[in-house]
């Protein structure tokens, strides 16, 4: 061999460290892990630990912001059982049965929260408040009386209504009502009343509802049936209004679309619009402005979903005289 001589040195180092045992071993020995988290359980501000909640018999109240915070975590979900009850979790498994009371607050059976892992309880406790407004009537009916309400949450029907309208428009008129933009599915998942924790949240909710309904209307396709006059340009809502006016009175068609028009106008509500214009838009949706924001958010979603189903019924009867 020629060139510089190289050397390779190999060695090993062994080191022994003694690890003293912890006071408890929840993973290896299955010891109970004390949860150092405390919840307000009554009007006087009494606090109880997460472990003590598993004894049952109590209820907890949370700010509505809790739901959006949980849903911001990967693997989370929100399912609806009735108008004011559902299941929510920040993890793929499980789910806490919750209810919404008359003040728009979240109420939960304390025992259910007590069984959550510590990392999840750390999220929940951050939104815990003293009891106010009573237990959700529908949650109490389901968990105490075993008589679940027969009501429905509009959030659970947004995507279904859109899909059924598209199917019926294709069947009856051979047109595509909605374009089905690839982002619509994700936006629909984010549409829920808990976005409306304040006026800004209400406007943000309106913006997303407008995106999945108004902005996604396939104007070109619908105008194959509702043809605008020469040199006249119709927007999305005017096109749908004139489509409906083929089968019903034009004034009725305008009334059907009024809530969706109101939502479309509110999408710019945070852009310093005159307060009179904003209130007129809320009036079109028939939102009671004296109610909690969460309830106003519910009314907004309900009005739009209800009118989508009115449009669907008209399409289904298109060929009938």
What would you call each of these model-derived segments?
Residues 102, 112, 274:
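A broadly conserved detector of short glycine/acidic/proline-rich loop/turn motifs that flank catalytic sites
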Residues 254-283:
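Histidine-centered, metal-coordinating catalytic motifs and their short helical/loop contexts
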Residues 278-286, 316-320:
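Structured alpha-helical bundle/scaffold domains in large eukaryotic membrane-trafficking regulators
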């Amino acid at each position: 061999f020629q060139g510089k001589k190289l050397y390779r040195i190999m060695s090993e180092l062994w080191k022994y460290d003694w690890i003293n045992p912890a006071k408890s071993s929840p993973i290896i020995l299955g010891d109970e892990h004390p949860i150092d988290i405390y919840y307000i359980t009554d009007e006087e501000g009494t606090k109880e630990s997460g472990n003590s909640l598993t004894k049952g018999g109590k209820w907890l109240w949370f700010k509505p912001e809790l739901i959006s915070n949980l849903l911001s975590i990967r693997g989370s979900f929100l399912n609806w059982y009735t108008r004011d009850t559902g299941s929510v979790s920040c993890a793929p498994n499980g789910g806490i049965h919750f209810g919404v009371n008359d003040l728009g607050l979240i109420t939960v059976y304390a025992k259910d929260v007590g069984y959550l892992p510590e990392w999840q309880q750390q999220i929940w406790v951050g939104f815990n408040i003293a009891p106010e407004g009573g237990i959700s009537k529908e949650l109490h009916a389901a968990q105490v009386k075993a008589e679940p309400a027969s009501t429905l949450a509009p959030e659970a029907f947004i995507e279904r209504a859109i899909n059924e309208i598209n199917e019926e428009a294709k069947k009856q008129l051979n047109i595509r009502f909605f374009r089905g933009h690839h982002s619509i599915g994700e936006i629909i998942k984010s549409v829920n009343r808990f976005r409306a924790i304040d006026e800004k949240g209400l406007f943000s909710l309106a913006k997303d509802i407008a995106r999945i309904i108004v902005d996604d209307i396939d104007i070109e396709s619908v105008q194959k049936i509702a043809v605008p006059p020469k040199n006249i340009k119709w927007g999305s809502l005017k096109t749908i209004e004139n489509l409906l006016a083929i089968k019903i009175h034009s004034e009725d068609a305008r009334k059907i679309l009024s809530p969706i028009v109101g939502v479309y106008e509110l999408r710019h509500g945070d852009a310093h619009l005159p307060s009179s214009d904003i209130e007129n838009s809320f009036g079109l949706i028939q939102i009671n402005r004296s109610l909690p924001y969460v309830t106003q958010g519910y009314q907004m979603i309900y009005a739009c979903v209800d009118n989508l189903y009115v449009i669907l019924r008209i399409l289904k009867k298109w060929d009938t005289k």
